[in-house]
Amino acid sequence: MAIVLCITMITIPTFAATEKKPTLMILPSDHWCEQRFYMTTWDNQGVKVKTADYQTAFLQDRELTQVISKLGELLTKQGYSLKDAEQETKAVFNRIAEDNVTMSSTSWSTLAETPLDMIKKRAKMDILVQIDWTINSDRSVTFTLEAFDSYTSKRIATSTGTGKPSNEIVPIMLEQAIKSKIKEFDKQMDTYYADLNQNGREIVLTIKCWANWDGNLEIENEEGDELLDVIQKWLKKNTVNGVFNLSDATETFAQFEQVRIPLYDEEGDALDARGFTTMLRKHLVKECEITSKVMTRGLGEGILVLGEK
């Protein structure tokens, strides 16, 4: 099989000129949902997995909405913009049956995503904030706040504390307890996001080959570069400071971890794993005449399957 492989590079800016606070979305923690029986079973390609049932939690627990609203007010005062967790969750769960898999239009190959992956992908928030709280016997409230990078699921900030005993409603008790801790929580997130601005956002990029494709990652161009070499040279030019790590590679599979991509594209729009992987897809189809399909898991993993759509 004759395939012409070329190495045309595209460069993109490291980050937008004007830095801005990341976008947040607030959800209850898995522990909070478990304690209140807001859990559901998700079918992960035949394996039953328990996951938080956010839709039922929002429908049945009025206190949750009030708590998220109060926490949202505190974070908004720190300069963050918020995604509406209840509306985003409702939209995802209403379409979960049809959106649960992504398929190849010709081979019907599937790629499963968790409900939380789908919420992240739809909402496109930078950081997921999860809250857990417990009412103690003396009418004080103990809380835990955790912030996670929506792309990597890495914990980037945490705060815990106990408020003074109070006869106020729970949302007010939590607001009072969290208020004294919010600046330190904000500082942790700021430090992390400053690193992203400087060094790029971290994603995972996976390259696969359809079983019915007669090519693989070892086919060579006229200069003797294998397809995997071509992809790595493109990554070196298009990642921030050329940072990525080839963690695994075979004839038909390659996985790149710690791939540092710019926060924003040339138009100043937020760049996620799908956008970055699509850039590589366009490069391969234009310069190397290789058709491929882009898939994603959440915001932070791009999967490029070579050989067909």
Regions found by a protein language model. Name each.
Residues 29-32, 87-88, 146, 150-151, ...:
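Solvent-exposed coil/turn segments that connect beta secondary-structure elements
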Residues 40-113, 121-122, 225-264, 269-285:
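N-terminal segment of the mature soluble domain
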Residues 280-309:
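C-terminal basic regulatory modules in eukaryotic proteins
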